[in-house]
Amino acid sequence: MAITKDDILEAVGAMSVMELNDLVKAFEEKFGVSAAAMAVAAAPGAGGAAAAEEQTEFNVILAEVGANKVGVIKAVREITGLGLKEAKDLVDGAPKPVKEGVDKAAAAEAKKKLEDAGAKVDVK
């Protein structure tokens, strides 16, 4: 006699959380799959446009230094906490990221400080 889908559902429904955990591990081992990988694979189909609208991490990029290089170096030091040499190297290497993975408010604040110093800034 073959086991039906309903029989399997009844058996799974009667299992405790620990038994279900063991069952999932057994499936992963037997079939060479991962329950986590399936969840990740389903996420991209959710819509890339919605993810772009809800961006939570931003990168502040120093695009151009402008005429006031000293002021920009001071602003970079204030924003990043870098030493004078490191800040100067960052400014000389523009375009370069000043801050990465910051929230929207921190990115806006950094952009304002750099623009007030005369730099051209991109937030991505």
Swiss-Prot record:
An annotated Gene Ontology molecular function: structural constituent of ribosome
Keywords: Ribonucleoprotein, Ribosomal protein
Pfam families documented for this protein: Ribosomal_L12, Ribosomal_L12_N
One GO-annotated biological process of the protein: translation
A single cellular component GO annotation: cytosolic large ribosomal subunit
Lineage: superkingdom: Bacteria
InterPro entries: Ribosomal_bL12, Ribosomal_bL12_C, Ribosomal_bL12_C/ClpS-like, Ribosomal_bL12_oligo, Ribosomal_bL12_oligo_N_sf
Keyword Ribonucleoprotein belongs to the record: yes
Family note: Belongs to the bacterial ribosomal protein bL12 family.
Subunit structure: Homodimer. Part of the ribosomal stalk of the 50S ribosomal subunit. Forms a multimeric L10(L12)X complex, where L10 forms an elongated spine to which 2 to 4 L12 dimers bind in a sequential fashion. Binds GTP-bound translation factors.
Protein function: Forms part of the ribosomal stalk which helps the ribosome interact with GTP-bound translation factors. Is thus essential for accurate translation.
Name of this protein: Large ribosomal subunit protein bL12
Organism field: Cupriavidus necator (strain ATCC 17699 / DSM 428 / KCTC 22496 / NCIMB 10442 / H16 / Stanier 337)
